[in-house]
Amino acid sequence: MSIEDVLLEAEEKMEKAVEKTRQELASLRSGKAHPEILSNVSVEAYETHMKLKDLAAITAPDANLLIVQPWDLTLVDSIRKAIEESKLGLNPIVDAKLIRIPIPPLSEERRLELIRVARKISEEGRVGIRAVRRHCLEELKKLEKEAHLSEDELERAEKEIQKLTDEYIEKIDRILAAKEKDLMKV
């Protein structure tokens, strides 16, 4: 393994941590309807648990309504039940072959609670990035011990990894700021 390999691994893993954080924040409900709200809803189907997005088309025809169209109509009740039991505070209405989900406006209290959750998710993302940094620094130290790196090369690589860490944590901070702004919009 070379310095370049370690840096490449760091960048890939940090990008994955940012993407995971982005997806988790997208699934937090804001004041308007968007299909990502339901992306993490788990439905009991075919004797297993599956993501709702794998079982149905989810659309947002307007800012206050989501429509779920199951591909298998026998799953309508299971999907309705899963949405009701999710902690999203939504009340699905079964309408023949589809499920309508009105999105009520968020109360101030609920907005603040969602911001706390968003901050927690973001902190988990930052912790993930720091764990990648720690792992990569250990890899560099191993390379130095094996005499594949000089002290100067090690120091340069450590600075590069710190630069990547700062860059990816900044990305998470920007995503969080945008989500907080979105949640506070009335």
UniProtKB/Swiss-Prot annotation:
Query: What is one process in the GO biological process aspect for this record?
Result: translational termination
State the compartments where it is located. Answer: Cytoplasm
* One function term, GO molecular function aspect: ribosomal large subunit binding
UniProt keywords (A-Z) are:
Cytoplasm, Protein biosynthesis
Pull one GO CC term from this UniProt entry: cytoplasm
Q: Which domain of life is it from?
A: Bacteria
Family that this chain belongs to: Belongs to the RRF family.
What role does this protein play? Answer: Responsible for the release of ribosomes from messenger RNA at the termination of protein biosynthesis. May increase the efficiency of translation by recycling ribosomes from one round of translation to another.
Q: Mind telling me what this protein is named? A: Ribosome-recycling factor
Q: State the species of origin.
A: Methylacidiphilum infernorum (isolate V4)
Q: What would be the name of the gene that encodes this protein?
A: frr
